Amino acid sequence: MSAEAYLWFKSLHIIGVIVWFAGLFYLVRLFIYHEESKNMDNVLKIAFNKQYTLMEKRLANIITTPGMILALSMAICMVIMQPSWLSEKWLQIKISFVLGLVIYHSYCYKIMYSLQNGTSTISAKKLRLINELPTLLLFIIVLLVIFKNNFPTSVATWSVVGLIIFMLASIQLYAKIRKKNENSLSNE
């Protein structure tokens, strides 16, 4: 195959990755809103449940999953063109993180079905934590692709640790501010 074909595969792979991640980021955000709508009065709860269910299904089935399929199929095409890359340590590590992302994607479907059926036991706070996982995976995967076998372990390790701490602190701070605002509104 030609170098041009490889560039097409690579371009479509990048587009698929962007679509996939955009879908995952928004999907879990919808789950958070869906979960929070359970606290509304019955009429609103029913209306929001129907709307969030529809939005989640469309996002998952029309955007997120096709993005994943495009990203993975183009990655397979690139590896078929360059099979020697499979011996590269950075690619082996990247593949393991991508498999983690596929598992995360599948877990999102489980959450989606449980929200639709009214059997979800995951709090909005836990969903906010879950929502940060693809950010971490994206961070690691991009660093692996850019640096390849020269991956800056010490810098990357501390960056990931710092990012995790920052995200956890941000989630906690957001929850406190939100709760404080809700309490002040209910006291008025």
Predicted regions and their residues:
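Polytopic transmembrane helical bundles with strong interfacial aromatic enrichment
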Residues: M1-E188
